[in-house]
Swiss-Prot record:
<keyword id="KW-0472">Membrane</keyword>
<dbReference type="Pfam" id="PF04286">
    <property type="entry name" value="DUF445"/>
</dbReference>
<comment type="similarity">
    <text>Belongs to the UPF0754 family.</text>
</comment>
<keyword id="KW-1003">Cell membrane</keyword>
<protein>
    <recommendedName>
        <fullName>UPF0754 membrane protein BA_0862/GBAA_0862/BAS0819</fullName>
    </recommendedName>
</protein>
<keyword id="KW-0812">Transmembrane</keyword>
<keyword id="KW-1133">Transmembrane helix</keyword>
<dbReference type="InterPro" id="IPR007383">
    <property type="entry name" value="DUF445"/>
</dbReference>
<dbReference type="GO" id="GO:0005886">
    <property type="term" value="C:plasma membrane"/>
</dbReference>
<feature type="transmembrane region" description="Helical">
    <location>
        <begin position="357"/>
        <end position="377"/>
    </location>
</feature>
<dbReference type="InterPro" id="IPR016991">
    <property type="entry name" value="UCP032178"/>
</dbReference>
<feature type="transmembrane region" description="Helical">
    <location>
        <begin position="1"/>
        <end position="21"/>
    </location>
</feature>
């Protein structure tokens, strides 16, 4: 009976010692958090292993993340994964659709993003671009003649329009001289003509008798204006003037209208500020609705695909520029010892318990062996 009690005792003591030893060893990985002293002498094994080696641990964790976890090959493989790409495209489509179907005004959205000043800047930039384009256009075209400056199609239209212009002018002239206003104007012109020629007026009066000069001249003027020869004459005159104009420099226009006036007139006609303001007062949905389907079905997938392709091709450079090892090292270095302990235990809690149990099991087995040895020795 004493023998079995001895074996049970040695087994129990072995299990307790083995389990406690392993438990103590695990605790000493983290505890104590700070060095302990007896007088001026530091107690051995203080602080614990992990608190003592925290900086080295931070460096090694950083290397481990970069060299074994977040590797360029692993990330590149993920970026080219078809299922991942489909999921990302779908997510992007949903998020973009939320934005472009927003009923808030563009002005309100810009205010939320703290870029409300964009209206003023956009107006100034558009006016600047228009001004620069007009000035560049004028600088170039001022070196040309009108024949060089105007497109061939414009030349043809003008030349084809000259006979019609002649007919229009003559038609309006006939209509004018047939009116009372035209007759009155013609009468004054005749009176002015004969005012300094008194004898000639008397001579004409002898021939015309009681009929006024204007009554005789008016039908003739109208008849002259209605003749085909007159139309051809006016057409020839306009054609000659057009030929002269084609040979003149566009720069001569500056004599009548300065560049600044041209620019100012165009800017006033365009009304940039008013146009920008109206545009910003529209809702995001109003602006994007005409191209919504194109954005969702084409632009977003293409953008995501090209972005992922670029990311896959440059992943190594991106990771190098991110300095992930340094980031991990800095973050771990900022952890308190308590937090670091909780972090490690949250991952290895079950395994550390099994190590404690294993120590107890081995201690118990050693106790049994000791009991058997005592039995044989007796």
């Amino acid at each position: 009976m004493n023998i079995w009690l001895s074996m049970l005792t040695t087994t129990g003591l072995g299990a307790i010692i083995g389990g406690f030893t392993n438990h103590l060893a695990i605790k000493m990985l983290f505890r104590p958090h700070r060095p302990m002293y007896i007088g001026k002498f530091q107690v051995p094994f203080t602080p614990g292993l992990i608190p003592k080696r925290r900086d080295e641990l931070a460096v090694q964790l950083g290397k481990m993340v970069v060299e074994h976890l977040l590797t360029p090959e692993g990330i590149g493989k993920k970026l080219t994964n078809e299922e991942f790409q489909k999921g990302l495209i779908h997510w992007a489509q949903v998020e973009v659709d939320k934005v472009i179907t927003n009923e808030q005004s563009l002005r309100h959205m810009l205010g939320k993003w703290d870029v409300a000043h964009v209206e003023k800047e956009a107006t100034e930039k558009i006016e600047q671009v228009i001004t620069e384009k007009i000035q560049a256009f004028l600088e170039e075209y001022y070196t040309y003649t009108w024949e060089q400056a105007l497109p061939h199609s414009v030349h043809e239209k003008i030349e084809n329009a000259i006979p019609n212009v002649s007919a229009f002018i003559l038609k309006r002239a006939i209509h004018f001289f047939e009116s009372e206003e035209g007759k009155s104007r013609l009468s004054r012109m005749i009176d002015d003509f004969f005012a300094s020629r008194g004898a000639l007026l008397n001579l004409v009066g002898m021939f015309l008798g009681n009929v006024s000069v204007v009554d005789r001249v008016q039908p003739e003027v109208i008849k002259f204006l209605g003749q085909d020869g007159t139309k051809q004459l006016l057409t020839d005159v306009l054609q000659k003037e057009w030929e002269k104009l084609k040979g003149r420099d566009v720069k001569e226009l500056e004599t009548f209208v300065e560049k600044e006036m041209i620019v100012s007139s165009i800017l006033s006609a365009v009304k940039v500020e008013e146009t920008v303001s109206k545009f910003l007062n529209q809702s995001v949905q109003q602006v994007c609705e005409p191209v919504r389907e194109t954005i969702i079905e084409k632009v977003v997938p293409n953008a995501v695909t090209k972005g992922l392709k670029w990311g896959g091709e440059n992943v190594e450079s991106i990771l190098n520029n991110l300095h992930l090892a340094e980031i991990v090292q800095q973050e771990v270095s900022t952890f308190s010892t308590e937090r670091l302990e909780d972090l490690v235990l949250s991952i290895t809690k079950n395994e550390l318990k099994m190590i404690t149990y294993l120590g107890a099991l081995l201690g118990g087995m050693i106790g049994i062996v000791q009991g058997l040895l005592l039995l044989f020795l007796k």
